[in-house]
Amino acid sequence: SDVYKRQVPNGHMAGSVSRVASSVDEAVAMVEDLASHNVDLIKLMITGGVMDAKVKGEPGILMMKPDMIKACCDAAHKHNLPVAAHVQSPDGVRAAVRNGVDTIEHGSVLTSHEIDAFKEKNASLVCTLSPALPMAKFPREILGITDVVQYNSNVVFNNMVAGAKAALENGVKVGLGTDTGCPYTTHYNMWRELKYFTKYVGVTPKFALYTATLGNAEIAGLDAITGSIEVGKSADILVADKNPLDDFKNMAVPYMVVARGKVYKEKLVKKYEKCETELDKYC
């Protein structure tokens, strides 16, 4: 999928993977331009982030004004494009959901106000513990990060866990993701996200597996195509030698993978052993 991230000056990822808009009109023009290139969705960077934060508490600061959020969402929805958003605070969640964002990536502590907004707008929360756990739990010297970054990472990690729990307890749809590309967050370790989901959020292995498969497909609007093994759906299957419900690590080295009907048996992924050794200490 093509994911395009929208941002404001000095916001999260501005100047790297994000386009930068200084006004509502400029932001809407960017959404229109992206829509003309047949993208799959629009992503907004609504609050600050951990890696670019300069002070403690900055990851949750609301960086994009509600009128810009709404204008971007309205423009995207006009083209039937869903809107995702990087959000790491209650204020950010409230501003995002109330102004049209469809899926919140990361999340935060949720009060009754945020829960009500999720339900009213039929929005979803995507929990991503994989990028936050190493930054919060690993010794700083391994990552080469500052005290500020680790402090913020702990806040973000704990708030994501609390937010996911609150969402599930109140009937808000929750998905799982990895935010791959962050330090010690690889493309091949989705199984760890499921394990974190059971360990820290407290769900059953069966529910975690559902969330990562059909649950995610439902959030993405792809459940008629993939997410479960059914007649007429795309054959997207990971086959393991042992039952993943006994231990999600059984998916780490699959017997084979079927993607869109094509079978892959050769182990094509080269893993970073130092990364695996450190991550194994936590699950």
Q: What is the predicted function of each stretch?
A:
Residues 1-4:
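Short, small-residue-biased leader/transition segments that mark boundaries at the very start
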Residues 9-15, 52-57, 140-150, 189-199:
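Short glycine/proline- and charge-enriched loop/turn segments
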Residues 124, 128, 132-151:
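Active-site loop ensemble at the mouth of alpha/beta enzyme cores that anchors a bound cofactor
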Residues 212-214, 231-277:
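C-terminal cap of metal-dependent C-N hydrolases
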